Every structure is written in C-alpha cells, then in structure tokens.
Amino acid sequence: MMPDDNSNSSTQNSSALYKDLRKEYESLFTLKEDSGLEISPIFNVLPPKKDYPDYYAVIKNPVSFNTLKKRIPHYTDAQQFMNDVVQIPWNAKTYNTRDSGIYKYALVLEKYLKDTIYPNLKEKYPQLVYPDLGPLPDEPGYEEFQQKLREKAEEVARANAARAESSSSMNSTEAARRLRKTRTSVKRESEPGTDTNNDEDYEATDMDIDNPKDADFPDLIRKPLININPYTRKPLRDNRSTTPSHSGTPQPLGPRHRQVSRTQVKRGRPPIIDLPYIQRMKNVMKVLKKEVLDSGIGLTDLFERLPDRHRDANYYIMIANPISLQDINKKVKTRRYKTFQEFQNDFNLMLTNFRISHRGDPESIKISNILEKTFTSLARFELSKPDRSFIPEGELRYPLDEVIVNNISYHVGDWALLRNQNDPQKPIVGQIFRLWKTPDGKQWLNACWYYRPEQTVHRVDRLFYKNEVMKTGQYRDHLVSNLVGKCYVIHFTRYQRGNPDMKLEGPLFVCEFRYNESDKIFNKIRTWKACLPEEIRDLDEATIPVNGRKFFKYPSPIRHLLPANATPHDRVPEPTMGSPDAPPLVGAVYMRPKMQRDDLGEYATSDDCPRYIIRPNDSPEEGQVDIETGTITTNTPTANALPKTGYSSSKLSSLRYNRSSMSLENQNAIGQQQIPLSRVGSPGAGGPLTVQGLKQHQLQRLQQQQHQYQQQKRSQASRYNIPTIIDDLTSQASRGNLGNIMIDAASSFVLPISITKNVDVLQRTDLHSQTKRSGREEMFPWKKTKGEILWFRGPSVIVNERIINSGDPHLSLPLNRWFTTNKKRKLEYEEVEETMEDVTGKDKDDDGLEPDVENEKESLPGPFVLGLRPSAKFTAHRLSMLRPPSSSS
C-alpha cells in the first residue's frame, strides 16, 4: 500500500503545482502600465529570428510568455518556473536601451514578479528563492560575473568527462545507445539554429523543453552537449570561439579544414555579410520599428510612406527632397549608403520634411521629437560598440556586388548552376543570396539550393513538370570557382500566364513547391517574392502573355526504385547520400493510398485534376506542343491566362470558354462558304476565250470581291465586341507593371493602358475641368503623369477616384451578364426640368428656424452621381436661403 500512497501523493502535488503555476501565469496577462496599456503583447512571443538576428547573439536564454505556457506542464517544482519567468524582464533589459519603451515595460514586469508572484509562491513553497541573474551588460561587475559562469561551466564539463570515463564498463548496448544519442545532438548542433557564433544560424523556438538546471547558467546556450559530452566530436563547422575545447579529440585547424567545413554547413538562412557600419544601420532600424507610443501606435508609423502624389500635391510643392522611412530602409538593404553619416543625414532630412509639412499639428511635432531623441540614442549606442562585435563568425567578410567567372558576371539574385560533386552531369540549381571576399583573397557565394525530382523522397505516383525543381531550406557556401553557368527558375503561377520577357542565359526551370527534407513533404509556394533575396524583391518581372497554356506532367524518374514488396503502410525511406557538399545521390519513393482530393494535380492516381494539367493517361488536346518546356498552347484560354481582377465571378471562366468555342464555329462556317480563288478572272486551262466564259469569270471575281469585303467587315466588327477588347487589353496590360484591373460594372470599363490616338479634345477638356476644380498650381506637378483620367463613353484608362453609383440597375449591370447578352444597353430616361419652390411667396414666420444645412448631404451626395454637379441656378437659390434677411424688408 505504501507505494500506491506515495504515487497518489506525488500526483496530487503535481496537480497542485500545475494549478498554482497556471494561476500565476495567467495573472501576467493582466499587467498594465501607468497609462492603462497592457504589456503582455510585448513579452508574449519571442522576436522573429529573421528580423532580429542580433537578439539571439546577445540573449543566450530566450524566454517568452508562450515559452512558459508550454513548459508549465513539465515543471517539477516552483523554482524552475521562477527561474524562467525572471529571465523575461532580464532579457528585455539586456537587449533594449534604458530610455526605450520595452525597458520600462520590463521594469513593470520585474516589479510585479518581486512584489506579487514571488510572495504568493513563497507561501506555498518555502524553499523558493528569487534568482539572481547578475548585473546587466552596462552595469559594473558584468564581465566578472560572466567569467564566473564560464568557470562553473568548465567545472561541470570536466566532471561530466571524468564521470563518463569511469563508466567505461557499461555494456555495449547501452554504449551504442548513448553514442547514437550523442551523434544526434552533434548533428543537431551542426545544423542551422545552434551555432552561437553565427547570428543568422541560431533559430530560437518556444517548443523546446529545456533542462531546468540550465537556468543556473543564464548566459550560456541551452543544449551545451557540444562541448561537454565525452563522445562529441567537433562538428564540421569551423568554430572559432575563444573558449577552448574540452574534447579529447584533436581538432585540425588548417586552412584546408576551414574550407571543407564551411562548404558543408547546412544553413537555414543566408549568413550576415555586411560591414560593421551597415549592421549598425540595420540594428537602429529594427529597434525603431518595435518602439510603441503611449497611445499604442508605432513610433515610426507616421513616417513609413510619403503622401499620395495625387491626393496631396501641395506636399511635393512644399518639400524639395521628399524621403520616407521606407526609402531609407530600402537604401540600407541595398547598401547604397557608403557611410553611417549618410544614413544619419537622410534620417534628419526625413524629420525636417515631416516638421515642415506638419507645422500646424503640435501632436505630430511631438512625435517627431520623440523619434529624433530615440534615433540619436540608438545611433550613439551602436557607434560605441567596437567593429569586432559585428563580425559574426570571427572572420571579416567584405560584401561584393559582382563576381566574374569565365567572362560571365554574377550578381545577388542571379540563378546559377553550381558544380555537383555527386553528379557532374547534373549541376546544382541555386539562387545567389550573398557574395563576399575574405582577407585571403578568395571569393565566396551563398546560394539557396533547388532539388530536382530524382533528388527528393516522394510518393511513387507523384507527377512532375518538365524541368521542375523544388526549393529547399539549404543555403550553402560555395567558392565562386564552383559556378558552372547561369540558368533561370520561374514560378509556376507566373509561367501559367506567359514567358519571362528577358533573354535567358541557360536552361529554364519551373518551381511550384517547397521541399521539406526533414518531413519529406512538398508545400506549394504561395508568395514567390518571399523566396527571393531582399535586394531584388521589389523588381518587376515582365511577362509576355501566353493564353491557353497547359502543362504536361510526367511520372517520377525514380519510380523504378520502389521495392517489389512495398505496401502503403511502409515507413518513409531516406535518400541515398553522397558527398556532404552536394544534394543526395538519389532520392527514394514509397506507396500511399489514393488521394481523395488533389487540387494541384500532384498525383497520377487521384480522380480529379486541374484543367491546366495534362497527365500521362489523359486524352491529347489539339494545340502547339513545345517538347522542350513540356507545354501545349491550345485555342482555349485557361482561367490563369488573364491577370487578376478586383471583380471575380464564377461565370467568367465558362464565358471565356463559350466565347472561344463560338468563335471557332463561326470560323468553320466561314471557311465552308469560301470560294476557290485560283485562276479566277482568267479562262480555263486550254479553253477558248469566249464572251460567255469571260462573263462567267467576271461574275466569279465579283463574288470573290464581295466575299472578301464581307469577311473584312466581320473582322473589323469583331474587334469592337467586348470579349475581344478585353482579350487585347489583357495582352497589352500584362507587359507592364500596372497593377490590378478593377472591374465593377459593364458601363465603366477600366483599362490599364494609356490611350494615344484621337484623344486630344478629351485630354484638353479633362485637364480644363480638373483645373477649374483644383487650380492650376495643384495640377502642375502631375498633370502629365501615367494614369491620367479620361471620361467618355466606352473603355477608359485607370480610375483613381470612384463615383458613387445611383443604384440604377442599368448602371449596375454585372460584367458576366453584359458578356452573355453581348449587346449595348440603352439607358431609358426622360429629360425633366429642375423645379424650384417660390421662396419669396412663403410666410417668413412659418417656423422661425434656419434651414438645416447638414441634411443637404442626404439629398446631394458627393461626389455626385456620374460626376454631375449642381447647376448655377440651384446654387444661387441655396445661397439666397442662407442669406440673412435684410433690414429693409
């Protein structure tokens, strides 16, 4: 009975501990600052690694409220919870400056922990102590405290090593198990997210359940097995840490070893390749973006973008050199600043422009002063740090804008073929993310790898496009001498609409999916720009439209590798690896049950398939086949051939198909009526020239001319029907970066191109009317810009302001209904004169009240229907009603 009693008691204690910790955890979300703003959103989640890589270089034990939520069920005593929760404000004060908002929030949280949570838990758990994490980096005694921690860690490492040596008599099974476990940890350490010497490579997560004992070493990385386990061998990465290694294995440190280790590093992100002054600028911008005002809005929100040139033309008359925070950030990312001082000058210019344009708004001026003070403090702090603190891997790397290999120039963002150590006939497809040079004169690049189908692990029934590649999460370093040549990878969504409008240097590959090597799964890429280097994300991708393009899909090139006894319940196999500097030698295939739903046409065994995909067993279609790209261009346009519109209807795609089939039928009918035209107008071969024969030939020639005239007339008429106009404009619009086409009603088409013929009168009239409303001074800066509005019956150019619809069904006709009727609707209306009541004939003492001017909005909405404005007569009438009665009357 005693064991059962002990077990029940332990369970009750665990349940009570969970309830107590959960209660204190939930109370954290009730904390507010003096102004009433909740502070929990600041500490709820860890900052993104992508945006704040330096955070994880400074903070060795990142903890958030979300971290506590996941760890509470695993705490065995209250001290573990206390160690973690105290770490949150300590981290915030370590990373942020003293005059920042987050530092103040951390003080509020720290005070609550000392005054409320700690006393509450102390009553129930008397052994609880408030952890002392030591001084902050800017406080005296910080270096001494860190040195003591390092010495303590070394003692623990030596003790673990001695304990491991004394346990050499353990059985072979246990030794093998521990060895496998250690190798797993070493592999994990060598993968992205664990090397503390690389800011970009450490990936923090709230999912880790760490050893509570690690809380005793707040400035040491969790998972310290890489240096203290007796079975650990040094990972392939060249760790240039100043802390000596305690491994018993000799570590080669020669140049050859450094080169091999660098190329074998599996990065999860491209490395930081910036000079110290650029990293200083990036740090300042990142901290500014997370600063929050007392009102809850971001400190930089008002400075992010410039005013709209059309809506606030006076701003560009007033400000000679407009610049926004977005412009500054773009110049920082593209390394256009050559010194930190240039960055400061632009920031001060932005503040000056803002104060000039908001000189009548004291609240905005106050915000600009706060921003200036914060910026000055951050800049001073960044400039005070030595340059060596910005060298992430212990070696200075000079960023390059260009490298030249075999007379071919390569830049960041270029697609390239890299030497494949496993198969020289299949170069690695990659995109260049970084270019740099080391002090020894060698030039390096970092590229994101794209796998070919035969290099992945996938289902045996999976289908692939011709020349398809999959994006991976591997960002590998290469010497520039590994460059073989150029290539180009196009996103599938863009390739559906047309061909890239550029000269291709090398083979063309198609990419639709991202491949996860750990889980062996394929995920469709929804946002292609997120996969590109930030230096080229804002560049336009010109496309030559191709309507009616469909894609052949082909079986897996390694389907023959499926074992004969394979079943749908087998484990997912592993690929066959070769050189660590290259993709797998060959992937693997496995079986799974048939997919009930296959929206993307990924598998040959599924029942459904998109119309733009042709699988191996599908019936062939008529069209122009391109064997090299694995595509076919049919006479039927696909739904993806048109650019995206603001108005979407389920009937539009079917209407396009109906229209195409109708046009084909008409063409066939016309073809059947055609008359043979050979030798018309001349006598038959070898026949005599008679009057009757001559008349017959003249009649045939007349019929031919009439037929040609009718055909020409039909052809001209077809150019003006609505579907043809839409198709033509679609082709023209897709050649430029003109944004989305917004279509609301058939009576107001919007064409994303400028009209250049027979519009002189319209342009002069339109400019004249706008000048009357806005004044010539406001019109001058933008009267000739692209997107000028022309109002007339029929298609028009880009609409920048929308007129309120009157609700007339003739003006609200849906676009699909307009296409179906294919007829112009006539507006039925009758002209009526404006009637006015006689104001002078009324009794002046009817009600003794002045007219209600505010109700005017209900009867005269603005902007007025179809651009109409009140007449001068009606305006005079309203003014007379508002005029006070004269004393003479």
Curated annotation (Swiss-Prot):
The protein's name: Chromatin structure-remodeling complex subunit RSC2
Q: Ranges of Polar residues compositional bias?
A: 241-250
Q: What does this protein do?
A: Component of the chromatin structure remodeling complex (RSC), which is involved in transcription regulation and nucleosome positioning. RSC is responsible for the transfer of a histone octamer from a nucleosome core particle to naked DNA. The reaction requires ATP and involves an activated RSC-nucleosome intermediate. Remodeling reaction also involves DNA translocation, DNA twist and conformational change.
Q: What is the effect of changing G601E?
A: In dpm18; defective in plasmid maintenance
On whether Transcription regulation is a keyword of this UniProt record, the answer is yes
**Gene coding for it:** RSC2
Biological processes annotated in GO: chromatin remodeling; chromosome segregation; double-strand break repair via homologous recombination; double-strand break repair via nonhomologous end joining; nucleosome disassembly; plasmid maintenance; regulation of sporulation resulting in formation of a cellular spore; sister chromatid cohesion
| Organism field | Saccharomyces cerevisiae (strain ATCC 204508 / S288c) (Baker's yeast)
Q: Which UniProt keywords apply?
A: Bromodomain, Chromatin regulator, Nucleus, Phosphoprotein, Repeat, Sporulation, Transcription, Transcription regulation
Q: Name one GO molecular function term.
A: chromatin binding
Biased-composition ranges, Basic residues, are: 255-268
Ranges for domain BAH come to 408-526
Entry's Gene Ontology cellular component terms: RSC-type complex
Question: Please, what other remarks does the record include?
Answer: Present with 2330 molecules/cell in log phase SD medium.
The Phosphoserine modification is found at S682
